[in-house]
Structures are given as C-alpha cells and as structure tokens.
Swiss-Prot record:
Pathway: Secondary metabolite biosynthesis; terpenoid biosynthesis. It comes from Artemisia annua (Sweet wormwood). Mg(2+) 3 binds at D474, S478, E482. The gene is CASC125. Its cofactor is Mg(2+); Co(2+); Mn(2+). This is (E)-beta-farnesene synthase. Mg(2+) 2 binds at D327, D331. One of its GO terms (molecular function) is magnesium ion binding. One of its GO terms (cellular component) is cytoplasm.
Length: 577
C-alpha cells in the first residue's frame, strides 16, 4: 500500500483537549517488557508469483465440469423416486466435503428445501442410521430446524442408544457428526455424542477396521465436520472419496481442478500481500512485532476463500496485520503513558493528535488512517454507497478506543486474576474478533445493507459465541506462555482463583464453555435467521479457524505441526490433478 499523506485525510474535529504527559516521548531509560518472537519460517519465498501455463485451460475445464454437476443435482432433485433423494443428499455431502459447494449454492439450497418440504420429519430412509444422520446434519447445517427426536427409534426403553448399533460403524460415524449440530438442552444429541465417541474409539482400535474408515474416524474424533474449514476438509476428503468404488469421476476431477485454480489465485494474492508487508519495513521500524503475514493470510482464507470475495479478503488481511501490530504494541512494547495517549488519539481520529504520539506510534496511526482511506477509495471506485458500506466506521473507531483503553487499564492492574465474568466481558472487547467479522462485510455489495452493520455492531449471540470460542481456545493453549511473559491473567487463571480449581479442572471447565458457545452458534443458525444465512458464515468460520489455529498451541505465533503442513498444502505443494 502506498503511503498516503496524513494531511490529505478528512478528520473529525474535536474540541476536547488531548491529555498528554509532555515527558512521554522524552523519558530516558524507558523499561519495555518485550518478548523476542521467532522470525518467520517462510522467509521471502512468497514474494514472487509465477502463473502456471495451464491455468487458463484448468479454468475452462472447471466451467465445463460445473455444468455437468449442476445438471446432475437438478435432475436427481426432480425425480419422483424417493431413493433418488437418498442419492441426492449423498451427492450434496460429497460436493460440500470436496470444497466446491460455493459453485452450487442455489442448487443445494433448492434441493434441501425440496427435501425438507417433501419429507418433513419423516425421512424416506429413516431406519438407516447412516442415512438419517446425514439427512439430519445437512438440513441442520442449512438452517432447517428438524427435530433430534428422529433418533428415538435407535434408542431403547431406557432412553439409551441401542448397543446393537455398534455393529454399524458408518452409522455410528454419521450419528457422531450429526450430534455436533446440537443446541442447548438437546439431551438426545448430547447422549448421542457420548455414545458414539466411546464406540468410535473402540472401532478405530479394531485391527479388522478398514484403513479408510479408521482414517475418517481419527479425523472426526480430532475435529468434527461441523468445525472443519472447507479447504482443509477438501484436502482430507479427496483421497478418501477417490477410494470409494461409487465415486463420481467428474466430481472428483472438478474438486482437484478447482483446488488448483484457487491455489494459484491465493498464491498470487499472498505474493501481493507479502510485498505490501515487506514495503512497510516493520521488521526494522517496529522490530517487536511478529512477522506472521503468511499465517495471517491463512487465517483470512478461513473466513473467505472464494474468488468473489477477493477484495474483501484484502481488506481483512490488512486489518488483521495491523491488529497484530496493535496487539504486540499493547502486550509487548508500549508503556502505560504511551498507550493512554494512543487510546485518546484513536478516539478522536484527529490530525491534531499526531504530534502528541511517540515516533513509533505515529507510523502505526498513519497507516491505520491510510488503510481506512484505501478502503474508502476502493469502495468508491466500485460504485458502492460508502455511507452504507462503512456505516460501522464510527463504531469501529469507538470499539478501537474501548479496546485500547481497556487493555491499558488491565495492563496497569498487572497480571492479577479477576472474576471470570469480568474477564469475559472485557476480553470480548479487547479481542477485536467482532471487528474482524464486521470488516468481513465491507466490500460485499450483494446482500449487505445498513441494517447488517447495525446488527453486527449490536453484538448478537452468534457473534458473541464465535468470539468466546476464539478467546477461550486461545487461553487453553497459550495461558502458560502468557503468564511466563507477565501477561494479564487468562480465563484459566481467573477461574482457578475464583473456584479453587486446579489447572486441569479449569481447562476442562473452559472447554465446556467452548462447547456451550458452539450450541449457541448452532441455534442462531436455524431459520429464521436475523440476517441472510451467508452472512452468518464469517462468524462460523472464525470459530472453525480456532480448531486449527489453537489445536495444540498458538499456531499463529508458532506455526508448527498441522498448521505448517496445511499452509504448505495451500501455498507450496501444487495440487496433483
């Protein structure tokens, strides 16, 4: 991004004086509690991008195969044969798991709507545990509120799932996946989850278990489908689907070609963003900041990976990286006095604040303004009504002020644990996850209105639940490291102090809170929804991202294991078609 002169920006006027300690910028021997982060593991390998020679041909093949799959979806949906509808949900499941559902959103919606209207609560293959579980999961995922009472036929007179079901491995696996669509007080699905976990573990350990099934069980126990990112599931599922004797060759070929085409697009975007980041020269100007631009782009792809969201993806990416800068500044470098001034400057958003800031903060402040201007100019060129598209702008500034102000106050209080409820109310502001979800709507002119931004700025339950999941999963894996570097107490320490629980007990309690938050997400995804269904996906995908990012440790700061492997699959290793 080119540097825009800050004097060219139209600022709001403010008559309130900025309270400044004249000695802030000149204090000698300022003590800074910095932490030395590891350098980027990627170096400069993504700065350049070479377009594959066969990219145009692949795009043409994708378009041809899309038409074939679309015809099949429409044809099967139009059949009057009930068992063809069983085949239809299996096809939809494969399309979704192969990562190509975004090509067929209308066809999938119409097909599942037709199935819901046609069968209601009486699925045609209701005695088949695998089939009814798949039917239930797909309809719930699409927002149709089918009752979990459909599983009562698989329970005994005591209300427990029949032990005879353990002989149906595929059915047990399908029921397990369906159970993750549960909402609050849905005892049947709670019991289903407990029952299937036990039996899947036994099945996977059986030497006679099919290797493909064992792989699927291990993946499911590690991360259920409801919480899997689409692109990662596509990587997992393609080899499994290919082994199925009844697989659709056109569908498989489309999935591989589409993954390859998107991979090229993403690598090109990553090259652009790496150049932008390198040109900022923050490694020299702000050496305390984590150099995690590749990890940041992976993070953003979890929210939007589709081609039509390229512009929004770039807005999100730059927002993400500047939030990393702010996070490291508040957690790892700035003094209390500096942070207080910066808080006031962000709140006023006025040019008069610039001279009051320390030199390193002037850079941050100016670049935040530049990003805002860049977004305005880009949206203006696109013919969008900026007053609607950025109606949350004032809210973002207010939220930014709250973030910095609360972080500052917490830093001044030190690392002492406060009540968990207080910690959660504060961390929902300081985490900035709600801001990222709001920014995910900027640049989307399709179904986004001024009411959309009013809705997201009200912090509705699905946004809160998504933010809770991110915050708590981060705490579970990183609280020890945070304490070692003198960070504020996490939810683990807060609950331990409040309840007298051990660290292990606290982690178990916080994990249950994560499960409760997922139930809220599932409930808020059922129709009728507060906003169009596609606008719920950024909140859902943000929560899904945590299942990858915080599966073992803080995968953003320490990209190791699965996290590193996934990024290599996305950006380094070409898809073999």
């Amino acid at each position: 991004m080119s540097t825009l002169p800050i004097s060219s920006v139209s600022f709001s006027s403010s008559t309130s004086p900025l309270v400044v300690d004249d000695k802030v910028s000149t204090k000698p021997d300022v003590i800074r509690h910095t932490m030395n982060f590891n350098a980027s593991i990627w170096g400069d390998q993504f700065l350049t991008y070479d377009e594959p020679e066969d990219l145009v041909m692949k795009k043409q093949l994708v378009e041809e195969l899309k038409e074939e799959v679309k015809k099949e979806l429409i044809t099967i949906k139009g059949s009057n044969e009930p068992m063809q509808h069983v085949k239809l949900i299996e096809l939809i499941d494969a399309v979704q798991r192969l990562g190509i559902a975004y090509h067929f959103e209308e066809e999938i919606e119409e097909a599942l709507q037709h199935i819901h209207v046609t069968y209601g609560e009486q699925w045609v293959d209701k005695e088949n545990l695998q089939s009814i579980s798949l039917w239930f999961r797909l309809l719930r995922q699409q927002g149709f509120n089918v009752s979990s009472g459909v599983f009562k036929d698989f329970m005994d007179e005591k209300g427990k799932f029949k032990e005879s079901l353990c002989n149906d491995a595929q059915g047990i696996l399908a029921l397990y996946e369906a159970a993750f669509m549960r909402v609050e007080d849905e005892t049947i699905l709670d019991n289903a989850l407990e029952f299937t976990k036990v039996h899947l573990d036994i099945i996977a350990k059986d030497p006679s278990c099919d290797s493909s099934l064992r792989t699927q069980i291990h993946q499911a126990l590690k991360q259920p489908l409801r919480r899997r990112l689409a692109r990662i599931e596509a990587l997992h599922y393609m080899p499994i689907y290919q082994q199925e004797t009844s697989h659709n060759e056109d569908l498989l070929k489309l999935a591989k070609l589409d993954f390859s085409v998107l991979q090229s697009m993403h690598k090109k975007e990553l090259s652009h963003i790496c150049k932008w980041w390198k040109d900022l020269d923050l490694q020299n100007k702000l050496p305390y900041v984590r150099d995690r631009v590749v990890e940041g782009y992976f993070w953003i792809l979890s929210i939007y990976y589709e081609p039509q969201h390229a512009r929004t993806r770039m807005f999100l990416m730059k927002t993400c990286m500047w939030l990393v800068v702010l996070d490291d500044t508040f957690d790892n470098y700035g003094t209390y006095e500096e942070l207080e001034i910066f808080t006031q400057a962000v709140e006023r958003w006025s040019i008069s604040c610039l001279d009051m800031l320390p030199e390193y903060m002037k850079l941050i402040y100016q670049e935040l303004v530049n990003l805002h201007v860049e977004m305005e100019e880009s949206l203006g060129k696109g013919g969008k009504n900026i007053s609607n598209s950025l109606c949350q702008g004032r809210w973002q500034k207010e939220l930014g002020s709250q973030i910095t102000l609360v972080e500052t106050k917490m830093a001044k209080r030190g690392v002492h644990a406060q009540p968990l409820e207080e910690y959660m109310s504060v961390s929902m502001v300081t985490g900035t996850y709600g801001l990222m979800i709001a920014r995910s709507y900027v640049g989307r002119g399709d179904i986004v209105t001024e009411d959309t931004f009013k809705w997201v700025s009200s912090y509705p339950p699905i946004i809160k639940a998504s933010c809770v999941i991110v915050r708590l999963m981060d705490d579970i894996v990183s609280h020890k490291e945070e304490q070692e570097r003198g960070h504020v107490a996490s939810s683990i320490e807060c609950y331990s102090k409040e309840s007298g629980a051990s660290e292990e007990e606290a982690c178990e309690y916080i994990s249950r809170k994560v499960e409760d938050a997922w139930k809220v997400i599932n409930r808020e995804s059922l129709r009728p929804t507060a906003v169009p269904f596609p606008l719920l996906m950024p909140a859902i995908n943000l929560a899904r991202m945590c299942e990858v990012l915080y599966s073992v440790n803080d995968g953003f700061t320490h990209a190791e294991g699965d996290m590193k492997s996934y990024m290599k699959s996305f950006f380094v290793h070409p898809m073999v078609v």
